[in-house]
Amino acid sequence: MRSHILGRIELDQERLGRDLEYLATVPTVEEEYDEFSNGFWKNIPLYNASGGSEDRLYRDLEGSPAQPTKHAEQVPYLNEIITTVYNGERLQMARTRNLKNAVVIPHRDFVELDRELDQYFRTHLMLEDSPLAFHSDDDTVIHMRAGEIWFLDAAAVHSAVNFAEFSRQSLCVDLAFDGAFDEKEAFADATVYAPNLSPDVRERKPFTKEREAGILALSGVIGRENFRDILFLLSKVHYTYDVHPGETFEWLVSVSKGAGDDKMVEKAERIRDFAIGARALGERFSLTTW
């Protein structure tokens, strides 16, 4: 696992609470890459390429700094964290993200952009702690605790889930560099950088042949009307069992083949390539249109 804790800050709960109250009033809308999630998934841009409050698309900045949106003005504590903790010269985008009773399917980010993947640096500052919220990164499942700042290797196959209704708000700050860099350069305040903290790694059950056979038996259940539901179901398996998240798509292809529906097989292969292979900037994918 390349993802790891970068440091930890003490959150001012009173100031944070006021910001969270504002974020709760912002309407939930269709997200960029909304096909990656089900349930409650809400992203609110605080800084982005355009300064537009509805602009949720991450893209490379060309010689101009990230612009604050009107939402940034309404969350002064989070805005202070962004501008004092992080290296503003490298800031590409900052947004809050919330996930409740939902899963984000395994995927890779930055594949539609122009820089070398190692030049993108995504961080998550956890603002709230939901005990049943987890992230996965290749072969590991982690629970991010409130106040922890993580580097999330978003170029690897990764996923997120919250099995509960408890809010799990985070501040996602994306930075980018032009060449080789030291990760502590992500911070304006060098005292924040403390990468030796121990992570909360989730223990998982062994993935057995019997468990795999049970998954493949879904070929007797899957159909075009529940194809999307089966994908999200399979996306949760690796949080309980010790198996790579990328297997989600191999199971989906196999189950679709077992059902004998060529259209489903084609869609399963296409969502696999779209999520963890390559896609164009702004490209979308429908899981329900046949």
From Swiss-Prot:
Record's keyword terms, sorted: Dioxygenase, Iron, Metal-binding, Oxidoreductase
Top enzyme class: oxidoreductase
Temperature dependence (free text): Optimum temperature is 35 degrees Celsius. Is stable below 30 degrees Celsius.
Recorded GO MF terms: metal ion binding; proline 3-hydroxylase activity
Residues given in the record as 2-oxoglutarate binding sites: 168
EC number in record: 1.14.11.28
Source superkingdom: Bacteria
Its job: Dioxygenase that catalyzes the 2-oxoglutarate-dependent selective hydroxylation of free L-proline to cis-3-hydroxy-L-proline (cis-3-Hyp). D-proline, trans-4-hydroxy-L-proline, cis-4-hydroxy-L-proline, cis-4-hydroxy-D-proline, and 3,4-dehydro-DL-proline are not substrates.
Subunit annotation: Homodimer.
Protein name: L-proline cis-3-hydroxylase 1
Origin species: Streptomyces sp
